[in-house]
Curated annotation (Swiss-Prot):
Gene: tmem147
Family: Belongs to the TMEM147 family.
Single biological process term from Gene Ontology: multi-pass transmembrane protein insertion into ER membrane
Stretches that traverse the bilayer: 1-21, 35-58, 69-90, 101-126, 132-157, 167-189, 197-218
Cytoplasmic-facing ranges: 22-34, 91-100, 158-166, 219-225
Cystine pairs: none
Keywords: Cell membrane, Endoplasmic reticulum, Membrane, Transmembrane, Transmembrane helix
Protein name: BOS complex subunit TMEM147
Compartmental location: Endoplasmic reticulum membrane; Cell membrane
Coiled-coil positions: none
Membrane topology field: Multi-pass membrane protein
InterPro entries: TMEM147
GO molecular function, one term: ribosome binding
Length: 225
């Protein structure tokens, strides 16, 4: 039973990535090693972020249950490094914009999935007692994949030299929202004392709105040119 539960969680977390890779056409371009390089860039960026946070933002020692809004906001600002990392990955790949976006997003999201969820699923989902948090973790990995696709598309649009002026503001706003999404989520959860399923639903809704807005801008920009 425990192995069956682990298999379900593993399939829910990893199969959408495999299906996306196969159905997006990346496999036809032999983009596997490009995605691996994007994943390696993710690891380097996260290491730099960890060193920076450990140096300039030590653990906050406030009251129990209190939330350091200013400190967490400053920490969320460090996620700007993720945008720079995605831009670096896309700038090193030749090809159409769609290809660059998919390679960067797949490599980035897969590296995060392996590094942050593989071990917890292997250790926890095989436990004797069933726990919904591993199902939630698997669903959250799918939300992260959609999130990074949207972020990669926004970075690609923002760095285009021929981006029309009237696109600059909405793209910048969406980039800011994507960068501070985790911080805003933590604020909502802390203020409204949300449960885990409610927080996951809110994250899915915010990611969906962000992704649909990004898709609208991307389609209008590509077709407009």
């Amino acid at each position: 039973m425990t192995l069956f539960h682990f298999g379900n969680c593993f399939a829910l977390a990893y199969f959408p990535y495999f299906i996306t890779y196969k159905c997006s056409g990346l496999s036809e371009y032999n983009a596997f090693w490009r995605c691996v390089q994007a994943g390696a860039t993710y690891l380097c960026v996260q290491l730099c972020k960890m060193l920076f946070l450990a140096t300039f933002f030590p653990t906050w020692e406030g009251a129990v249950g209190a939330y350091d809004f200013i400190g967490e906001f400053m920490k969320a600002t460090v996620d700007l490094a993720d945008l720079l990392g995605l831009h670096l990955v896309m700038s090193r790949n030749a090809g159409k914009g769609e290809y660059k976006i998919m390679v960067a997003a797949m490599g980035w999201a897969t590296a995060e999935l392996v590094m942050s969820r593989c071990l917890p699923l292997w250790v926890g989902a095989r436990g004797i007692e069933f726990d919904w948090k591993y199902i939630q973790m698997s669903i959250d990995s799918n939300i992260s994949l959609v999130h990074y696709m949207a972020v990669a598309a926004l970075v690609w649009m923002w760095t285009r030299y021929d981006l029309p002026t009237h696109y600059r503001l909405p793209v910048t706003v969406l980039l800011g929202l994507s960068m501070y999404k985790a911080f805003l989520m933590d604020c909502f959860v802390h203020i409204f004392i949300m449960g885990s399923w409610t927080a996951l639903l809110l994250k899915a809704v915010i990611t969906g709105v962000l992704s649909l807005s990004c898709l609208t801008l991307f389609v209008s920009l590509v077709h407009g040119n």
